[in-house]
Amino acid sequence: MSDGNVAWILASTALVMLMVPGVGFFYAGMVRRKNAVNMIALSFISLIITVLLWIFYGYSVSFGNDISGIIGGLNYALLSGVKGEDLLFMMYQMMFAAVTIAILTSAIAERAKVSSFILLSALWLTFVYAPFAHWLWGGGWLAKLGALDFAGGMVVHISSGFAALAVAMTIGKRAGFEEYSIEPHSIPLTLIGAALLWFGWFGFNGGSALAANDVAINAVVVTNTSAAVAGFVWMVIGWIKGKPGSLGIVSGAIAGLAAITPAAGFVDVKGAIVIGLVAGIVCYLAMDFRIKKKIDESLDAWAIHGIGGLWGSVAVGILANPEVNGYAGLLFGNPQLLVSQLIAVASTTAYAFLVTLILAKAVDAAVGLRVSSQEEYVGLDLSQHEEVAYT
Amino acid sequence: MRRLPTREVVEMKMVVAVIRPEKLECVKKALEERGFVGMTVTEVKGRGEQKGIRLQFRGREVEVDLLQKTKVEVVVSDDAVDEVVEAIVSSARTGKFGDGRIFVIPVEKSVKIRTGEEEV
């Protein structure tokens, strides 16, 4: 790997790391002030737990010697034999895992015990994230099938989004969820989070080329395009319904970013416009559906990341342009890629939801996921951290 | 000396409600539906009769003393007080500790700043 490539992946690693607290800020603004510290803290806890587990065995079971296409071996446990460029790749991938767990905290907003979250996140990294990373990026069965996931539409977004739905269904609704409207306490904080996410996503998608090359350039351009298109769609929807709220605009942009993630190294700008446009619409409809069904997946990881990642992963099979990176989708004469993508999407969606449901129920039965009603009333900043966001 | 214009004498009361912050929208809606639009809303911290809430934090007992609340103040004529109180109680109640308190206070007079008009 050239010095330029190394420099770009080092920078991309830092960019993706910044997305972890970015998720924390994005979420913190959307909860009540008594839970703001907790939401940001959960993102840092996600990072800390991931760093430790990734070094001990997470990287190895994701990218180690293939075992039946399902999981990696323990040959890289404690990073034994991981040197140079592999060490850089390990660190870059570590940040992806951390972001994914941070996204999942949407499901437990304002009501989960920190200790239980730590246990759940450790189990989830082991039994959901690591297998997905192996299946698609570590030479596992979906990679062998020919499924493509450039930067994590399935590994990151489908996994966290559908897991969030399962966890939300297990932990139950926030107190008062159906009695009154639970309003965001700080839209500026959410906008800061969104800014960090959009910024970091250039490293998330651009860095996934694993080189400073034309594919990386394309990835950054289409990432920016899809975000803007989907953000514009939500702005228009806002205007149709009343006023274009900033919270909606940035949520739309995040939907566009999630959707372009699996496709960033395979589609051109025209494809990105289509992906962003459809993502804006389907993610909005998913959010609307969740609200109507009174599902308290509080901060819409399922609607934005889950559905966005699902659509983007399917879109790869339709819109992949061989001029970008050599892979052709349905519109470029290769229906087989769409078949592979559909199989991959169906299996990752089902696995993420069902396995997370089992893990969440197990943790709930063992130690309880939820704080007491009194602790929830006081707020998690005080009851979990003995801190307050604002004095 | 120039006297400010005055209106007829109307007995006025200030209804002060300290409620859960998340119940503010419900309370506003309930008051608006009954025709009471004007109000002053303040973010406050407070504690009630039970003083604080005792919780186990990190293996030791800690008292959470002051909790986040919202104060709603509405000035109405004397004959509307019961309706305002009923609207607030019905919309702010959850039935759990910490639902809040309502105080009714006499108001001597009110002056509209733009016109100098007095209500006594």
Curated annotation (Swiss-Prot), chain A:
Alphabetized Gene3D superfamilies for the sequence: Ammonium transporter AmtB like domains
Domain of life: Archaea
Molecular function in Gene Ontology: ammonium channel activity
Site (Twin-His motif. Important for optimum substrate conductance): H157, H305
UniProt topological domain (Cytoplasmic) ranges: 28-38, 107-113, 171-188, 238-245, 288-300, 364-391
Topology in membrane: Multi-pass membrane protein
Membrane-traversing stretches: 8-27, 39-57, 90-106, 114-137, 153-170, 189-208, 218-237, 246-263, 269-287, 301-319, 338-363
Keyword Transport: yes
Compartments, record wording: Cell membrane
Main location class: membrane
An example Gene Ontology CC term for this record: plasma membrane
Keywords: Ammonia transport, Cell membrane, Membrane, Transmembrane, Transmembrane helix, Transport
pH dependence: Transport is pH-dependent, with a steep decline at pH values about 5.0.
Pfam families noted in UniProt: Ammonium_transp (PF00909)
Stretches assigned to the Extracellular side: 1-7, 58-89, 138-152, 209-217, 264-268, 320-337
Function: Involved in the uptake of ammonium/ammonia (NH(4)(+)/NH(3)). Transport is electrogenic. Transport the ammonium and methylammonium cation with high specificity.
Family: Belongs to the ammonia transporter channel (TC 1.A.11.2) family.
Assembly and interaction partners: Homotrimer.
PANTHER family in alphabetical order: AMMONIUM TRANSPORTER MEP2 (PTHR43029:SF10)
Full protein name: Ammonium transporter Amt1
Gene name of this polypeptide: amt1
From Swiss-Prot, chain B:
Binding site for ATP: T40, G48, E49, Q50, V75, G98, D99, G100, R101
Gene3D superfamilies: 3.30.70.120
GO MF annotation: an example: enzyme regulator activity
Signal peptide positions on this chain: none
Keyword DNA-binding: no
Family: Belongs to the P(II) protein family.
Subunit structure and binding partners: Homotrimer. Interacts and forms a complex with Amt1.
Role this protein plays: Involved in the regulation of nitrogen metabolism. Regulates the activity of its targets by protein-protein interaction in response to the nitrogen status of the cell. Regulates the activity of the ammonia channel Amt1 via direct interaction.
UniProt protein name: Nitrogen regulatory protein GlnK1
Gene for this chain: glnK1
